[in-house]
Structure formats: C-alpha cells, structure tokens
C-alpha cells in the first residue's frame, strides 16, 4: 500500500483556517487518506477543531485519520507537512496593547501585524515560538516542509532562515491571489483570463505584469485600464467583503509608482509616511482609511465564532468550499510530482537582485517533487526597490535584535519605520518602545546579551543593557516603582506556551537608584542561509502559465 502523508497543524485552534485547509486537502485524491494531527494548547479550541475535522472527513467520505495532541513534539512525529497558524497573546491583551499604547503618543494604526511598532512587537512575541517549532522539527521530522501562515510573515520567514537554515519553509499569504480577484472584479474580466507576475516582500509585492488574454492568444496590458478607471471615478468599486475598507490607497499609489501593490489599502496605508497623519483627518476621509481596523475585526470574529462553533457542533455534515489557500496545492505537488505555481515567502538568495540576499522575498515558486523552488525575478523598478527597502530596514533590525539578543535594535527598528518616524520624534519613539516592552513583558523573550549601554529618559529613568548580566530579576521601572521580584519578560518554551522556560533572559531596565550587576555570557549567534538553487539553475515560469 502506498504510504499516505502526515499533515500536522500547530495552532489547530484556528478552527476556521484549519477547516479551509483540511477541506482543500480532503478533496485531493492524493491526500484524502492522510493522517491529520491537530495540536493546540487550548483544550476547548482543540476539541472544536477535532469535531470540525471529523465532520469534514465524514462529508467527503475520506479515509483520512484525525489525531489530536497537546504535545507539540508528539504531533510532529512522522510529519511530512507542518502547517502553522497562531497568534501569540491573542486579541487581549497583546493586540489591544499594540494599538492603545501607541495611541497615547498620537500614533494611529490600522492593522499593526506586519510593520510599525505593532509589527515589531508581534515579531518579538512570535519568532521564539516558531524557532521552538523548528528546533523540534529538526529533531523529529527534519525532512518535513513548514508551511507558515503567521504574521509578521516577512520577519518570521527571515528569522527562521537565519537560525534554522536547513528547515524547508515557505511563508504563505493570500494577498497576491486575493488582490488579483479584486482587480478582475473591478475590470469585469474573468480571473481565469488574467495573467500576472508579482514580486517584492510580503504585504508589499507589486504586480510587475497584469495582462488580459486576447482571442488571438496575445496579452494586453491592463494597467492603463486601471489608471483610467481610477481617474474617472469608476474604480475602486465598493468592497464586496468589508464596506469599511475601500481600495483607494492602492489605486493612488498606482498613479504615483506605476504598479499595483498586492496587499490591501488598509494594510499599505501604515507601511508608508503618506496617508495616516495626526491632525490630518482630511487624508483619512479622502482615502477611506479605517483606523483601528484590526481590533474591530477581532471583536467581530470572536462574536461570529460563538455562533459558528455551536452550528458546527450540531451539524450532521459541514459543507466544503474550495479556498484560495496554497497549502493543499503545495502538498499535492510535493507528494505526487504534479507541478504547480504558488507565491511564497522565502529567503531571497538573489531571486530579486535589487533587494538584500538575506531578506524574505515574495516571489513565484514552482512546486513539484523536488520541493518549493523560488524563481528568478531580477531587478525591480527603482521606485519599487526604494519603497520596499524602507520596510526591509525595519524587518532587518527586528531580526537582528532577535538573533543577537540585542534589545537596542528594537528601538532602531522603530526609528526606521516610515509611519512611526513621520509621526514621532526620537524621544517619543524611544519612550513608546519602552512602554510597549514593559506592557508586553509576560509575552516576550528574556535575553542575556546586549552591548552595555545606558540612557536616561526625561522622567529620570535610566535604561541599562549589559552583556554580562545573568540575572533577569531587575526590571524596567519608572522612578519609585521598581519591583525587584518582577522579571522583565517570561521565558518562552515549547509550542506556543508563553510560560515554559527555554530561552535566555532578556536585557533589563533599571531605575537610577539600582546598583545590581551580575555576570554571564551572551548566547552564541547562529547565522545561515536557506539553500535555494543557484540563480543560474532557477526556472522562470512559462509566459503561457496563468498564475
């Protein structure tokens, strides 16, 4: 009998996402007999996911087997594919913190899951857990492919490639195919008649080509139609999924840069210094920018899930609809050798020659029995490279902070963020990062190592990082409020359990009256590169392929 694949879901309590991916998997003959291992640290959500998965199997009449695990290592045993989807810290407290603390400084955000101070903090919370998954994979299933659906995608992908270069990983997002659908809808052209090619970084890739197949087999550039429709007021059409989120920002950027960005307008608005400005409500109104959009979605999704969970429990069968996620396509291509094309986030390694070699790039990838093979793009138009590089700077410094355990680079990352820098001065940026680190102390790693440095804030607090510190006991505190029994951060451990002890203690912040010093050594830095085929051996997708 032919061996069936094992698919492990880490963070299986993300039930709606899990339902979509498993529904896709079960409809593919090559995967319908798979063993599906669900792992989550929340017993209730894990039970709900098991119920949903079981009913999907029943609906399809599949031979798939469903397992549930609270142990990450147990779930990974024998895995061929590892799908990861989770959010560290959830809506409360962490998402609320990421929005409310910056708001005190007049810094407003829309999504805060990719860049900016919200994206930096989310990366700081998330990457250590992804590293622990990679550590367990290297020990238990080193040949498995990691399909990562976690934000901040670019920071996560970059950090995994740096510390675990032998992990076969790809970061997956649905923005490329989702935006193609939106533009096809605006143009009133069937999506299957449109050919496109995009490249850049996650949430800031651009369509380098966007064309319509003609009756004679040739292709016509659709960019003039998009620009004309926007200037005539016909585009964008009202959103078919969220009336709070018109698509005006991206169309405006198209008229300035000549290319359409793949992530939504509400996302893109906070990646640049142009659209969200304190004291400029006219910009918010003109472009329909939905401030605090992500918290609103979280509240709506939490309420919606209450009804969905009850409906899934009572349903005899669960209807399956094909999703637009790439996961099942990748699994099918790797397992059967049947080729497919996806858009994936991988270590650049020269795919985009105008971006750093070690950054995380989003490019077309060919998938077959040999795995996921990024394709060569070359040099992006200079205006796109320049804009993307402003975001790469923030990602690079955040990863540097994580790799070297140097908290100073978190301040540097916020300093370089386009939106933050346009709104706040340097003292405000440093103070904001202080406040966010203090608020997130239960969710972020503790580090031993940072270069020794001191800085005094205007309120008299002195911040100290010392490479030789071994004890994490002293913490950040404003003058007169120091609690020596409160560690700055809680050590992060296996899976997504924030209270297990696995990572090194963090640099800590002292009040000026504290004199405590200890000794120790910084953790060894580990660098590397995910091995892609040499540029000369990479294949470029055929111009006849409709992506």
Language model regions located:
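NAD(P)-binding Rossmann-fold cofactor-contacting core
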Residues: 32-52
